[in-house]
Amino acid sequence: MAKQEVKKIVLAYSGGLDTSIILKWLKNEYGCEVITFSADLGQGDELAPIREKAFATGADKVYIDDLKEEFVRDFVYPMFRANAIYEGHYLLGTSIARPLIAKRQMEIAKIEGADAVSHGATGKGNDQVRFELGYYHFNPAITVIAPWRDWKLNSRQALVNYAKKNDIPIPVTKKRPWSSDRNLLHISFEGAILEDTWAEAPENMYVLTKAPEKAPNKPQYVEIEFKNGNAVAVDGEKMSPAQLLAHLNFIGGEHGIGRVDLLENRSVGMKSRGVYETPGGTILREAHMAVEQITMDREVMHLRDSLVPRYAEMVYNGYWFSPEREMLQALIDESQKTVNGVARVKLYKGHCRTVGRKSETDSLFNLDFATFEKDQVYNQKDAEGFIKLNSLRLRIRSLQAAAKKK
């Protein structure tokens, strides 16, 4: 669609430097109605001034939608039922938020009769892919405006200059020069000192977690109950998904849980450093795997585990709405029907580890079989035949090798 044909744009708006400048740029370049949409995914105080700021920067209409429960229930929980983790460290806090933002943005575009949507993701990053795959899933004909791929403001200083010229407040300061992205699952940090891969992230960067060495000297035990693979209660208290994750974030943050410093492989091909705080998610994943240990069949678990890296890549690369992710989700959800029980985890100075697990309804742990004491149900002599059959191919190979030496 030609620029002059665009009559109304819905912008995914965070209120940060990039999207504030994009809002003004869209008004200046397209001269049309621009509606901002901000998703409340648990950013906290960041959203407080966003309506006033959007109108002050030129927005014609402002949407601020509370999506916290939908975010955790329909996006975070399905992903955690899969134990998804990218490259062994990243719990996908940013990746899993983008599909929901894209979904709601496209709903607003339909309600408002907008012919274009826009986002603030750069042309170097993963988010441009995640947003736009979501857009096209809901409307294959939508016009997408990605300013970072179009404009000449190709540096942070150029953005600052544009902001000053157009009287846009600049939230980035010399004290906190890095960029951040926050939701109920995590907060991420990129840029500035983190572009030096040898430099340690400064302590004043962290928001959700205490430094482990400054965490309480006494450990805390937390019990998390699961039903069909979803966390439903903490220490016996039933909570909604968003309430539960927020509660675990607070507890985990007090004990320095969930800090990750990662050099990850972006979907566009380059490596990028990110520092993440995911206190509640770290506890949740540990507890979920503990309940699986006592309730999930061995072969089901091993098959599911073999698919986790692929599932995580789908989420990371923006394929949440893809048929392959939905197919894997159906398989994973089937495996979770027996994941009912309670895990007890111990939090202490940055560490979260399981110290107990139980299931009243679906435990596959049978003490009569597993005990090291005398039992009446397991004949240890039976193991001999099992071992001989399982070693047959190894014995044949050894005999063949010996014959070749003669």
UniProtKB/Swiss-Prot annotation:
Binding site for L-citrulline: 90, 95, 126, 130, 179, 188, 264, 276
Residues bound to ATP: 12-20, 39, 120
Keyword Cytoplasm: yes
Gene3D superfamilies, A to Z: Argininosuccinate synthetase, chain A, domain 2, HUPs, Single helix bin
E.C. numbers: 6.3.4.5
UniProt keyword terms in alphabetical order: Amino-acid biosynthesis, Arginine biosynthesis, ATP-binding, Cytoplasm, Ligase, Nucleotide-binding
GO CC terms, sorted: cytoplasm
Keyword presence, Ion transport: no
Localization, UniProt: Cytoplasm
Positions bound to L-aspartate: 122, 126-127
Catalytic activity: L-citrulline + L-aspartate + ATP = 2-(N(omega)-L-arginino)succinate + AMP + diphosphate + H(+)
Molecular function GO labels: argininosuccinate synthase activity; ATP binding
One of the Pfam families matching this protein, by short name: Arginosuc_synth
PANTHER family for the chain: ARGININOSUCCINATE SYNTHASE
Quaternary structure and partners: Homotetramer.
Protein name: Argininosuccinate synthase
Organism: Geotalea daltonii (strain DSM 22248 / JCM 15807 / FRC-32) (Geobacter daltonii)
